[in-house]
Amino acid sequence: MRFKLDGRIIFSKDVEEETQKDIVEVLENRDIFLKGVPEGKENEASKIEGYEFDGKDLKLKMTSGTYTRAHEGIVRLKKPIMEKVGRKHQIGIRDVAIDRYVVTLTAEPSKVSELKGLKVPECEVELESEKINIVFENLGDGELKRNIIDRAIKFVKNELDKQDQDLTFEVCKIAPGTIVSDYKAKREITFDTDPTELAEPNGWVKRFPGRGQWFYTAPMAKLFRAFESLIIEECIDKIGFDECLFPKLIPLDVMYKMRYLEGLPEGMYYVCPPKREPEMFQDFVNEMMIKKEIPIEKLKTLLRDPAYVLAPAQCEPFYSFFDHELVDVDHPSKFFDKSGWTYRWEGGGAKGLDRVNEFLRGECVWMGTPEFVETVRDDTLKYAENLAEKLDLEYWTEVGDDPFYLEGRKKEDRGIEFPDVPKYEMRLWLPHIKEERKGVAVTSANIHGTHFIEGFGIKDYKERKVWTGCTGYGLTRWVIGFLAQYGYNYDDWPELIQKKVGKLPEIPKLITWP
């Protein structure tokens, strides 16, 4: 893909000559756009092809490939410009405006022609023989924050790939996105503030240096444990799952067998074991002590090749446990794990408390006959819905459009058996989002058919059909969904939560925080 942008950074007053000189220094520092760009891909990052000052406006012409795309690049300029000129010249940035933005995708002429007449909200689609131009005009900061550009690109790419239709749409007997159940709260929901905005001022969380990570202080931790206890009592124990302790450092071979490496390779944290050579690490330590900075390039030479990932799905060890084993479907297995964090690299998608790279879940995984697997999946979902209704939390359940295990099977020709509905997703309503009715996914209930059975060579000793399923109860998201509807006032919480939480602990007492 190629990106071509005509845009403006709009200041609070006319940009005088001395201010312009300082801003130009920032514009000439291309390192701003290279952060996070892989070595050898620098030409794919944003470039400023031209600029002009006009009163309050800094007019920019920018291009890019797929790394630090032009619309990300213009936003990335705001912070270093303000650090350079804000206090020094008493000037601020009012807005970022994109006057015209052309995103160009390439494809075979036959596929391009199939898009004739395609209408995409917020933009125009122009077709050439081997190109699709997605054209945006008059976008402001608000549209950028709402990710309109990324959504439009994804929409066009999905249309372009219809010949290679996502397997979800082929196997699913109910259209993905269909709402199959919902519940309206009996009380009036008056709290309508993003819980992330209040969490840190209230002292319940503190930002951690890592992207998409938070330090959860005692009050938030108490609420987490309350929900964990409720989910175990109200959902997991009622179905008879046995608790196990799953490893969280997963060998790449396991991920390969799951076909996760085909479906979502960019969504994982890869782990490189260090070389066991103390004298080489001493050089690393010495350089760090002298330079007072971490010598990353030297550290890279001391690491072995990636060998593991941090668990992105939490259920991975279950399938490895049964790798090439003979099982008896008359004695099905039902395990659950709540022993640690799950990790997914959301990249730029990480935001707030609901979209994080590190989160807690109660993960249920089971194996048995197709009938058994479907019954258990339905029960895991039913009890989650019952719990939400006990807490008077407004929710809906819909057919999922992204079962994680199908990402690696865009095309299928090996006779894998799939369920009629691979995934149900239960969402708690987020009342602070006004533009559209949105919810946070708190429970994901999946059936895999024979996907993992085939991948791990698992067989029934009488050669009967064996399926697997998994349900993730997202503790982090249950808590965020709860706070989004009830807020932080303990007295407003339902009695069931108050009893589980007991007395809320105090926040840390610091002079400078919260």
Swiss-Prot record:
Reactions catalysed, as given in the entry: tRNA(Ser) + L-serine + ATP = L-seryl-tRNA(Ser) + AMP + diphosphate + H(+); tRNA(Sec) + L-serine + ATP = L-seryl-tRNA(Sec) + AMP + diphosphate + H(+)
Name the needed cofactors.
Answer: Zn(2+)
Q: Which GO terms describe its molecular function?
A: ATP binding; serine-tRNA ligase activity; zinc ion binding
Sorted alphabetically, which keywords does the UniProt record give? Aminoacyl-tRNA synthetase, ATP-binding, Cytoplasm, Ligase, Metal-binding, Nucleotide-binding, Protein biosynthesis, Zinc
Tell me the residue numbers annotated for binding ATP.
344-346, 355-356, 477
What is the superkingdom listed in this entry's lineage? Archaea
Q: Which family does it belong to?
A: Belongs to the class-II aminoacyl-tRNA synthetase family. Type-2 seryl-tRNA synthetase subfamily.
Any domain commentary? Answer: Consists of two distinct domains, a catalytic core and a N-terminal extension that is presumably involved in tRNA binding.
Q: What is this protein called?
A: Type-2 serine--tRNA ligase
Q: What is the lineage of its organism?
A: Archaea, Methanobacteriati, Methanobacteriota, Methanomada group, Methanococci
Gene symbol here is serS
